[in-house]
From Swiss-Prot:
It is an enzyme of class 5 (isomerase). The lineage of its organism: Bacteria, Bacillati, Chloroflexota, Dehalococcoidia, Dehalococcoidales. Keywords: Isomerase, Metal-binding, NAD, NADP, Nucleotide-binding, Potassium. K(+) binds at N73, D135, S171. GO terms for cellular component: P-body. GO terms for biological process: deadenylation-independent decapping of nuclear-transcribed mRNA; P-body assembly. This is NAD(P)H-hydrate epimerase. SUPFAM superfamilies: YjeF N-terminal domain-like (SSF64153). The keyword Nucleotide-binding applies. Its cofactor is K(+). Binds 1 potassium ion per subunit. Pfam families: YjeF_N. It comes from Dehalogenimonas lykanthroporepellens (strain ATCC BAA-1523 / JCM 15061 / BL-DC-9). InterPro entries: YjeF_N_dom, YjeF_N_dom_sf. Its EC number is 5.1.99.6.
Amino acid sequence: MALKFTTAEGQAITPITVPVMREIDRLAVQETGPNLYQMMENAGRNLAELTLTLLGESRNGSRVLVLAGTGGNGGGGLCAGRHLANHGLAVDYTLGDRDGLSEVTGRQLSLLELAGGREVDPVSPETGEADIVLDALIGYSLLGAPSGRSAELIRWLNAGNSRIISLDVPSGVDADSGLTPGEYVRPQTTLTLAWPKTGLLPRLTGELWLGDLGIPPAVYTRAGLKNFRSPFIAGYLVRLTASEQ
């Protein structure tokens, strides 16, 4: 069965595979822009905006926890945490692996700490439960079953009562196939980036949103998307409805 998505305005969107998404990222970073820092900032701000929207009037006094991996997905989550801290929310974070942090993600971590974000061990009973957890552990670069600290954090997250928003792809879900080779996050909401992927099955993502990274239309066309039409005419965040045909 083929997975299709539709926007609130009725635009039909055919999902893409991970290799196509990698090519879109490559073209943007190496040739056209926006660069990696800019796309990470756009991803984080979109995630922060969606978080504030979902919190609504309950945002005052809310606590957010960011679970961040070492790469671009983790950087987007940490960036979102900084924006939320700037808007008055209490923001904590934990890292899947501090030693492997990429340069751009490390920069986002420094900015979050400057905004008041604090590192915690969420598994510790002393930490307490967050209102919302931002899952930014793995993203579309999953290779096999999550292991080590990432697997531990996923198990802990699924056992709790916090509302979960996954960034791009629920951690542990194969973005191409929708297969789950091991532990995987079970979010209420997923914000996927740039374009939906073929593995974003509705039973795995919860409510699905699409976030604009600011990539020029010509990049999508060069990557092989025929008759490209931007879904972001109405805004930076687009609600998607899935159907399997």
